[in-house]
Regions:
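HhH-family (HhH-GPD) DNA N-glycosylase catalytic core used in base-excision repair
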Residues: 1-223
Length: 223
């Protein structure tokens, strides 16, 4: 969850040699990549947040949980548990204000998790897992890389098509940034975090630089 096993000295020694990152590491040494409590919830929130602000994505997540989650009673402010994969697989998710296509993407992910086709708890091969994710409608390389970074703790995950990364690194396209980022292996996730920190807008989600690809097709910049 808190990436406590990371070695900031080792990571900094590698990334600090790069002209794009050296000053950022000096200003903010020791950044760690935050994880999550639940891979499915993180993945749904990643889909909810595509192409919109943090504020808007948080609003949608709240609607989703209130409408489809399990209501509970606590002494504090927690009122609902996040919806189960089986529950979301059958839900009319577009009713919370999503486009039908985005709702179907979440339903497809939920169905795959409910059926055991996607299992965040037993990932052996990260590349194969990301490939299975990308077979689902509405999920492309950006989303798969972001999930690998935040839900699976992959230190080398890198969503090169992310708009904030492209802006912070002053690259015009995903291909050129991906080529430059090869020198950051095996710590590209940390490089992404430093670039996001430099993007400067606290209300801007990590997001793809172009519209989400249609299911089964790839584009030069995908979500």
């Amino acid at each position: 969850m808190f990436d406590l096993s990371a070695d900031p000295a080792e990571i900094g020694a590698r990334l600090g040699r790069d002209s794009l990152l050296s000053k950022r590491l000096e200003a903010m040494p020791g950044l760690r990549v935050p994880g999550c409590w639940d891979g499915f919830e993180l993945s749904v929130r990643a889909l909810l947040g595509q192409q919109i602000s943090v504020t808007a994505a948080t609003t949608l997540a709240g609607r989703l949980v209130r409408k489809f989650g399990t209501q509970i009673s606590t002494e504090r402010t927690l009122t609902h548990l996040f919806p189960s994969p089986a529950g979301l697989a059958e839900a009319d998710i577009s009713s919370i204000g999503l486009t039908r296509a985005r709702g179907e993407s979440i339903r497809a992910l939920a169905g795959a998790v409910a059926a055991g086709q996607i299992n965040f708890a037993s990932v052996v091969n990260l590349a194969e897992f990301q490939s299975r994710l990308c077979e689902l409608p509405g999920i492309g390389n950006w989303t798969a890389q972001y999930i690998a970074m935040r839900a699976l703790g992959d230190p080398d995950a890198f969503p090169a098509g992310d708009l904030g990364l492209l802006r912070a690194a002053s690259f015009r396209n995903e291909r050129d940034l991906a080529r430059w980022a090869e020198r950051w292996r095996p710590w590209r996730a940390y490089a992404a975090l430093y670039l996001w920190q430099a993007s400067g807008d606290p209300d801007e989600n990590p997001r793809p630089a172009a519209t989400q690809r249609p299911a089964g097709k790839h584009s030069t910049a995908v979500a």
